[in-house]
Curated annotation (Swiss-Prot):
<dbReference type="InterPro" id="IPR049428">
    <property type="entry name" value="RecA-like_N"/>
</dbReference>
<dbReference type="GO" id="GO:0005829">
    <property type="term" value="C:cytosol"/>
</dbReference>
<dbReference type="InterPro" id="IPR020587">
    <property type="entry name" value="RecA_monomer-monomer_interface"/>
</dbReference>
<dbReference type="Pfam" id="PF21096">
    <property type="entry name" value="RecA_C"/>
</dbReference>
<dbReference type="GO" id="GO:0003684">
    <property type="term" value="F:damaged DNA binding"/>
</dbReference>
<keyword id="KW-0238">DNA-binding</keyword>
<protein>
    <recommendedName>
        <fullName>Protein RecA</fullName>
    </recommendedName>
</protein>
<dbReference type="GO" id="GO:0006281">
    <property type="term" value="P:DNA repair"/>
</dbReference>
<keyword id="KW-0234">DNA repair</keyword>
<dbReference type="InterPro" id="IPR013765">
    <property type="entry name" value="DNA_recomb/repair_RecA"/>
</dbReference>
<dbReference type="InterPro" id="IPR020588">
    <property type="entry name" value="RecA_ATP-bd"/>
</dbReference>
<dbReference type="GO" id="GO:0009432">
    <property type="term" value="P:SOS response"/>
</dbReference>
<feature type="binding site">
    <location>
        <begin position="67"/>
        <end position="74"/>
    </location>
    <ligand>
        <name>ATP</name>
    </ligand>
</feature>
<dbReference type="GO" id="GO:0140664">
    <property type="term" value="F:ATP-dependent DNA damage sensor activity"/>
</dbReference>
<dbReference type="GO" id="GO:0005524">
    <property type="term" value="F:ATP binding"/>
</dbReference>
<keyword id="KW-0963">Cytoplasm</keyword>
<keyword id="KW-0233">DNA recombination</keyword>
């Protein structure tokens, strides 16, 4: 018993010395602090928020979003920025690809007048800007588009054709070590968009890999694989794309879930269409024949008209969104039993889907 008391005294003294040297909060018991509650920002897609398990992307963490060209990577990050700005948060966009379209961003709901934007010359400059913004504590969301475009200074100053083996990977590895702690301290969300490359000579398994080495894969709390699976048509006109997002890695909830939603050209994620689908799935929206009803009132004939009704009545869509989140997400940020009915398991049959109605 005396030995236990001596141990507790020694532990208390050690904790006191650590806090005195490194500051209060430098060491703590896991259950005593806000570390139990992860603050999140909505992705703009209700089904993806559900698949992530905590209601969105976690603050203070690194997130990687990767996929083929024209799969919706930049659109998804702009929707995250729009969601954050609606909550009064400050956002920054590091446009290493020099391809950000402010007109399109504005259509997605981004307040471009208050969006910080940088088009860096080198990869080192881009990552230094990220580090400076995160250390300031004044920026809540930083998006880097993309890792593949973060070109090391030595490569830019060299000749085309020169070999620069592993330069980008070393640059990213050093940056991750430096950024991870600063992001946690300032509670800043850092999203990296990444591209896909093919590994040569792979006979078995997936030949796809992402650029920038392995460091980002380890440091990322969430990794999302986004793919276009088909077309959304209005008659013969293609008005959008069916999109599937797989949660390949998740440190805040159960991984290997996936979400499917529509991205409409010029509008972004079809949030109201998701509300109709999820509402019907969980019996909050009644469907009788082609008619959709909510709280006993008819809201439209056909999914397209029901979607338009929710778009024109924001108070109704906000109420339905709140009810669905309360049902599908529990307080601990994990999965409720209802979620498994909607969020599909991690699989990919590779079939293209044609959806005539949106």
């Amino acid at each position: 018993m005396a030995n236990d008391e001596n141990k507790q005294k020694a532990l208390a003294a050690a904790l006191g010395q650590i806090e005195k040297q490194f500051g209060k909060g430098s060491i703590m018991r896991l259950g005593e602090n806000r570390s139990m509650d992860v603050e999140t920002i909505s992705t703009g897609s209700l089904s993806l928020d559900i698949a992530l398990g905590a209601g969105g992307l976690p603050m203070g963490r690194i997130v990687e979003i990767y996929g083929p060209e024209s799969s919706g990577k930049t659109t998804l990050t702009l929707q995250v920025i729009a969601s954050a700005q609606r909550e009064g948060k400050t956002c920054a966009f590091i446009d290493a690809e020099h391809a950000l379209d402010p007109v399109y961003a504005k259509k997605l709901g981004v307040d471009i007048d208050n969006l910080l934007c940088s088009q860096p010359d080198t990869g080192e400059q881009a990552l230094e800007i990220c580090d400076a913004l995160s250390r300031s504590g004044a920026v809540d969301v930083i998006v880097v588009d993309s890792v593949a475009a973060l070109t090391p200074k030595a490569e830019i100053e060299g000749e085309i054709g020169d070999s620069h083996m592993g330069l980008a990977a070393r640059m990213m590895s050093q940056a991750m070590r430096k950024l991870a702690g600063n992001l946690k301290n300032s509670n800043t969300l850092l999203i990296f968009i990444n591209q896909i490359r093919m590994k040569i000579g792979v006979m078995f398994g997936n030949p796809e890999t992402t650029t920038g080495g392995n460091a980002l894969k380890f440091y990322a709390s969430v990794r999302l694989d986004i793919r276009r699976t088909g077309s959304v048509k209005n008659g013969d006109e293609v008005v959008g794309s069916e999109t599937r997002v797989k949660v390949v890695k998740n440190k805040i909830a159960a991984p290997f879930k996936q979400a499917e939603f529509q991205i409409l050209y010029g509008e972004g994620i079809n949030t109201f269409g998701e509300l109709v689908d999820l509402g019907v799935k969980h019996k909050m929206v009644e469907k009788a024949g082609a008619w959709y009803s909510y709280n006993g009132d008819k809201i439209g004939q056909g999914k397209a008209n029901a979607t338009i009704y929710l778009k024109e009545h924001p108070e109704v869509s906000a109420e339905l969104d709140k009810k669905l989140r309360e049902l599908l997400l529990n307080n601990t940020g994990g999965f409720s039993s209802a979620v498994s009915d909607y969020v599909a398991d991690y699989e990919d049959n590779g079939e293209e889907v044609k959806n005539e109605e949106f």
